[in-house]
């Protein structure tokens, strides 16, 4: 018998998303909203689905959008910044 987890569930364990009510947003080739839960809480009418987590006795809610990181390129161009690192720097400075 072999156990494992999907890429998002395994990544969530790697960044410490292991307890109920913890959540993260991951941007890459897809955009994933990932929230840890203690049980099956699917809401398909809102495009949020429930899956087994990579850890025992844990579930997660997940909603996915494809090509998500491209929105950062769009935001950089929209604001007149040269690239995504410049956008992130500007966002951090605005938050100070």
What are the functions of these language-model segments?
Residues 1-96:
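Active-site core segments that coordinate phosphate-bearing ligands/cofactors
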């Amino acid at each position: 018998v072999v156990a494992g987890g999907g890429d998002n569930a395994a990544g969530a364990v790697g960044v410490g998303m292991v307890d109920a009510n913890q959540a993260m947003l991951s941007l890459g080739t897809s955009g994933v909203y990932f929230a840890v839960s203690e049980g099956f809480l699917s809401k398909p009418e809102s495009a949020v689905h429930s899956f087994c987590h990579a850890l025992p006795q844990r579930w997660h809610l997940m909603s996915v959008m494809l090509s998500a990181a491209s929105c950062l390129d769009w935001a950089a161009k929209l604001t007149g910044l040269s690239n995504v690192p410049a956008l992130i720097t500007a966002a951090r400075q605005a938050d100070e």
